[in-house]
């Protein structure tokens, strides 16, 4: 499902006080600074095997929200996984954790937001959960809802 991007500030103005705007401050690290799409989720801690498996599937213009527990100890996404996501049609990634290969990510046509960077690799045991509600920055990211992301922040709207 392709979602037309709308600036987050415009969405906030339209929705009003009930807006679901994420308070957590993410760094803009991908080459695409504006992205929107249906939400899919992964919860994993310092292990990116499940995340890579999900991004190996067709993304259909979706946004993968990754709850890495806020850990900056290891990177959950690097250039190889981001390219896999881009090639499979994902619009963007929102990572509550670290990424690496930031110079390469800036040159890729995919949205990537994360808390920070760390060159250290994660483990690859496959631990984690997918398609679960994830709450970050006062907002619950529910699979099937729509995430809008730009330089001003992230807004979540109810999906169809």
Swiss-Prot record:
Q: What class of enzyme is it?
A: lyase
Pfam families for the chain: RraA-like
Q: Enumerate the cofactors the protein uses.
A: a divalent metal cation
Functionally, this protein is described as follows: Catalyzes the aldol cleavage of 4-hydroxy-4-methyl-2-oxoglutarate (HMG) into 2 molecules of pyruvate. Also contains a secondary oxaloacetate (OAA) decarboxylase activity due to the common pyruvate enolate transition state formed following C-C bond cleavage in the retro-aldol and decarboxylation reactions.
What GO terms in the biological process aspect are recorded for it? regulation of RNA metabolic process
The record's section on NCBIfam families has: NOT-MenG, PRK09372.1
Query: EC?
Result: 4.1.3.17, 4.1.1.112
Its catalytic activity? 4-hydroxy-4-methyl-2-oxoglutarate = 2 pyruvate; oxaloacetate + H(+) = pyruvate + CO2
Q: Where does a divalent metal cation bind?
A: 101
- State the free-text cofactor note: Divalent metal cation.
What family name appears in the similarity comment?
Answer: Belongs to the class II aldolase/RraA-like family.
Matching entries from PANTHER family are given as: 4-HYDROXY-4-METHYL-2-OXOGLUTARATE ALDOLASE 3-RELATED
The protein here is known as Putative 4-hydroxy-4-methyl-2-oxoglutarate aldolase
A GO molecular function annotation here is: metal ion binding
Question: Source species, please?
Answer: Mycolicibacterium paratuberculosis (strain ATCC BAA-968 / K-10) (Mycobacterium paratuberculosis)
Q: Where does substrate bind?
A: 78-81, 100
Subunit and partners: Homotrimer.
Which superkingdom heads the taxonomic lineage of this protein's source?
Bacteria
């Amino acid at each position: 499902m392709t979602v037309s991007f709308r600036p987050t500030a415009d969405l906030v103005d339209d929705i009003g006080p009930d807006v679901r705007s994420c308070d957590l401050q993410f760094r803009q690290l991908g080459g695409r600074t504006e992205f929107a799409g249906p939400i899919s989720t992964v919860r994993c801690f310092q292990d990116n095997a499940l995340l890579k498996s999900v991004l190996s599937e067709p993304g259909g213009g979706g946004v993968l929200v990754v709850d890495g527990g806020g850990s900056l100890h290891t990177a959950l996404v690097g250039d190889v996984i981001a390219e896999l996501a881009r090639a499979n049609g994902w619009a963007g990634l929102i990572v509550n954790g670290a990424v690496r290969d930031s110079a390469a990510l800036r040159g890729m046509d995919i949205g990537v937001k994360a808390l920070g960077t760390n060159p250290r690799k994660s483990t690859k045991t496959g631990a984690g959960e997918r398609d679960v509600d994830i709450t970050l920055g006062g907002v619950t990211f529910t699979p099937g809802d729509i995430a809008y992301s730009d330089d001003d922040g992230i807004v979540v709207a109810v999906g169809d």
